[in-house]
Amino acid sequence: MNQAVRFRPVITFALAFLLLITWFAPRADAAAQWQAGTAYKKGDLVTYQNKDYECIQAHTALTGWEPSVVPALWKYVGEGSGGETPTPDTAPPSVPAGLTSSSITDTSVSLSWNASTDNVGVAGYEVYRNGVLVTSTSTTTAVVTGLTASTTYAFTVKAKDAAGNISAASTSLSVTTSNGSSNPGPTGTKWLIGYWHNFDNGSTNIRLRNVSTAYDVINVSFAEPISHGSGTLAFTPYNATVAEFKSDIAYLQSQGKKVLLSMGGANGTIELTDATKRQQFEDSLKSIISTYGFNGLDIDLEGSSLSLNAGDTDFRSPTTPKIVNLIQGVKAVKSHFGANFILTAAPETAYVQGGYLSYGGPWGAYLPVIHALRNELTLLHVQHYNTGSMVGLDGRSYAQGTADFHVAMAEMLLQGFHVGGSTGPFFSPLRPDQIAIGVPASQQAAGGGYTTPADLQKALNYLIKGVSYGGSYTLRQSTGYAGIKGIMTWSINWDAYTNNQFSSAHRPFLNGLSTQTTKEVVY
């Protein structure tokens, strides 16, 4: 008898058995579950919501940057490798740690904490005041409002995941609100912010310590990349030694002034297109700020530094790498220096209010940055110059350099607006104390947008006190916004060029507003 025929059934059965155990055996190459707080490198595989993703850019995972919503960081590669039937998620996230408070006023407090971890992913956090849920957030920060002056509250935070599992409460944090009488600003409740040139452009050469005492916040301009395409920023004083410049900063700070490092400018293109450049950015800024003792950082990116890639259509979840990396980098710098570190930004109108009608390229490109940093942002002073005309919330176009322009552009940030048209996602308003008006100090300072002191002050009287000047634009909030912070100008040097006419006109005006408005936010 043929031996091959005799043993064929045995061989067939053995082969079938081998195929069965291979099919049902656990896969050795199954991807690990994605977790917030984990450092991933390019090529790492993870599973999230039963789908597999490959890391395409090294980063540390954060809540809100899950693989399914950040294609700039993750590439979908197939259905989940964890098995045919996923195991139900019953494990709660870890307990939030490091709960701290900052920016305590008589009616509000800012809270922050360390990110929790979870076997699948943290979906968000719940904030409790005296044991009662007061707000939920997808980030590790929250602002609790509606508090009473001179009152002590106990705050806790719980983490939750997509399956509904909730962690135990964090360690309780006791916070006592202020009595409302503290001095909030460097010298008053209304600030005058100016940019100081670290270069000579024919305006005026001023030692930093000799800046007019009218200014509350001085933005030293600029830190710039060491070379084209680099993420490493550098700063060297142009008219003083390092020791002299550090002494000048300390001198201004002894007078109650805040001295910030401004990065970028018209010539300082900063494009953080990958994780390496982002790390260079973080490391170099931390070094510069620590060396000189700056009080904070100002973001003054223009041109191609911020531009939306094709297909990046929602400011709430950006996909353009240089925008994603900028957000992560600035958050890291802010976190490194703590709650008292000031963060400001000076975008052009096209990059902010321009997103009202169109979102793409430069139009609205700052909105994802402002949105992601709104809890960290001390002040936003959009440049109301070099812009031409812009459309307000009423659908009408207003020309730069007029009172109507300033009122219309400011109220867009105070009311919020739909992005990219009336059906687009809504950009929520900022707090009034986060807003200042940016204008040129003289006609020589900008290509357009200079506003006379009389026109700027009547715009501010309307915006802050609701005192109408009979213009074409009508405030949606007729009583105004008392908390608006003040005026920013380009620049201190151009102001000095005209014998400080700008600051001499506006400092007394701001002082007058300071005596009429109270209960501002403390920084």
From Swiss-Prot:
Q: Give the enzyme class.
A: hydrolase
Q: How does activity depend on pH?
A: Optimum pH is 4.5. Has an extremely wide pH stability range (4.0-13.0).
Q: Where is the signal peptide?
A: 1-30
Domain Fibronectin type-III, chain residue ranges per copy: 95-180
Q: Name one GO biological process term.
A: chitin catabolic process
Q: Does the keyword Ribosomal protein apply?
A: no
**Use in biotech settings:** Has a potential application in agriculture field as a biocontrol agent.
The molecular function GO annotations come to: carbohydrate binding; chitin binding; hydrolase activity, hydrolyzing O-glycosyl compounds
Any one GO CC term of this protein is: extracellular region
Catalysed transformations (reactions) = Random endo-hydrolysis of N-acetyl-beta-D-glucosaminide (1->4)-beta-linkages in chitin and chitodextrins
Q: Region (Disordered): which ranges? A: 80-101
Question: One Pfam family, short name please?
Answer: fn3
Q: What Gene3D superfamilies does its record include?
A: Carbohydrate-binding module superfamily 5/12, Glycosidases, Immunoglobulins
The disulfides recorded in the entry are none
List the active site.
302 (proton donor)
- How would the record characterize activity across temperature? Optimum temperature is 65 degrees Celsius. Stable up to 50 degrees Celsius.
Q: Which segments constitute the GH18 domain?
A: 190-513
Instruction: Could you list this entry's UniProt keywords, alphabetically sorted.
Output: Carbohydrate metabolism, Chitin degradation, Glycosidase, Hydrolase, Polysaccharide degradation, Signal
Q: Which family does it belong to?
A: Belongs to the glycosyl hydrolase 18 family. Chitinase class II subfamily.
Q: Any idea what job this protein has? A: Acidic chitinase that displays a broad substrate specificity, showing the highest specific activity toward colloidal chitin, followed by ethylene glycol chitin and ball milled chitin, but exhibits no activity toward powdery chitin and chitosan. Hydrolyzes colloidal chitin and chitooligosaccharides with degree of polymerization 2-5 to release mainly N-acetyl chitobiose. Displays inhibition effects on the growth of some phytopathogenic fungi, including Alternaria alstroemeriae, Botrytis cinerea, Rhizoctonia solani, Sclerotinia sclerotiorum and Valsa mali.
Protein name per its UniProtKB record: Chitinase Chi52
Q: Which organism is it from?
A: Paenibacillus xylanexedens
Q: What is the lineage of its organism?
A: Bacteria, Bacillati, Bacillota, Bacilli, Bacillales
Gene name? Answer: Chi52
